């Protein structure tokens, strides 16, 4: 394992790139919003390549909650960029060493603003997050979710690199990492051994660079999407790839913040969804006909993520990533494929009414 040398290499590379940019930094112009809304806005702005908004939300976090800024950048790198640009993921991970490193290579704002720029520009791949959704909810994994719970870690490691499907192999990784550390609303809790997982991946031939960057990313953010990038990286080497933009709905500003920042991860976003569900439109009539009263806001928050919040400006298209996205969107919500597509289309058309509810909540 060459983890320290690999990380030192990327820290040197990051320092050189920041130095080449010179002393002219973007304006530090924070917004007057909560840290939760700032985190939502920053991550979704990076997804959409909106550097202007990403910088302002990053400045907000750096001013009022800097620890949230660095953790959110880490999560965004693995969740939204991943195997599409592992170089960018590596640079973000390298910057997480701590304040002393960042002070030595230009300071907090110099480093954060540089990372925001390259993350906005990077091609995006959300396969790691889609993979986590599939593992939790796909019906084809019901037996494996139970069976793998009780297997010893050496057996899980063999399953993680065996002949099973990618979701089955990643499920074995999750249990071996430990669901006590990376919790799931579905998987049973058990202890794991993260060090054994990363060591084993190195031993059987995964590139040290890929494994040790994921190891450090996991150490910093404690999210299972970091180790998922290792098997996904190998899969990505086997398929033709190209990038294209998602079909993103028209944006509506609510003060200085776009409506799409108000999603299920923000209190105001859930309040707006609850108000929207009290209106009369095709989406709410569908909800009345198909969903029990309890849990409607949460369910529709997940649908909203698929039609607005989770969209990206430049998505990596490749067979495995496309399959995982399809499985997560249409085969996991507990609805038949036809109905999942139906409610997504209805909500997309009724987004102007949701934005009106967002305006009412925000003001």
What are these regions (language model features)?
Residues 22-23, 53-56, 63-363:
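C-terminal alpha-helical interaction modules of replication/initiation AAA+ assemblies
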Residues 1-24:
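Short, charge-rich, low-complexity alpha-helical interaction segments
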Residues 25-34:
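TPR-adjacent "capping" and linker segments in tetratricopeptide-repeat scaffold/adaptor proteins
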Residues 31, 38-60:
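Conserved helicase/translocase motor-coupling segment
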């Amino acid at each position: 394992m060459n983890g320290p040398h690999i990380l030192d290499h990327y820290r040197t590379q990051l320092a050189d790139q920041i130095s080449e940019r010179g002393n002219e930094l973007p304006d530090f112009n924070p917004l007057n919003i909560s840290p939760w809304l700032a985190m939502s806005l920053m991550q979704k702005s990076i997804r959409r390549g909106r550097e202007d908004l990403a910088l302002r939300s990053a400045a907000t976090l750096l001013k009022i909650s800097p620890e949230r800024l660095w953790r959110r950048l880490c999560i965004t790198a693995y969740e939204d960029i991943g195997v599409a640009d592992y170089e960018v993921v590596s640079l973000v991970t390298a910057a997480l060493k701590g304040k002393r490193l960042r002070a030595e290579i230009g300071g907090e704002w110099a480093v954060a603003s540089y990372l925001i720029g390259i993350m906005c520009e990077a091609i995006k791949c959300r396969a790691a997050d889609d993979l986590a959704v599939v593992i939790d909810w796909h019906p084809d994994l019901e037996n494996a979710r139970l069976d793998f719970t009780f297997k010893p870690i050496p057996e899980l490691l063999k399953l993680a690199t065996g002949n099973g499907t990618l979701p089955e192999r990643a499920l074995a990784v999750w249990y071996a990492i430990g669901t006590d550390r990376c919790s799931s609303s579905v998987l049973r809790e058990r202890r794991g051994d993260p060090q054994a997982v990363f060591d084993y991946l190195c031993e059987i031939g995964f590139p040290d660079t890929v494994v040790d960057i994921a190891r450090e990313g996991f150490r910093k953010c404690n999210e299972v999407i970091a180790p998922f990038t290792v098997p996904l990286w190998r899969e990505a080497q086997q398929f033709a790839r190209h990038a294209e933009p998602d079909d993103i709905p028209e944006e509506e500003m609510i003060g200085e913040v776009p409506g799409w920042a108000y999603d299920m991860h923000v209190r105001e976003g859930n309040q707006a969804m609850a108000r929207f569900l009290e209106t009369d439109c095709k989406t709410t009539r569908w909800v009345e006909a198909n969903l029990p009263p309890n849990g409607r806001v949460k369910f529709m928050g997940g649908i909203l993520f698929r039609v607005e919040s989770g969209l990206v400006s430049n998505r990596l298209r490749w067979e495995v990533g496309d399959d995982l996205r399809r499985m997560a969107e249409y085969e996991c919500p507990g609805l038949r494929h036809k109905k999942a597509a139906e409610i997504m289309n209805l909500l997309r058309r009724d987004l102007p009414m949701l934005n009106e509810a967002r305006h009412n909540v925000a003001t």
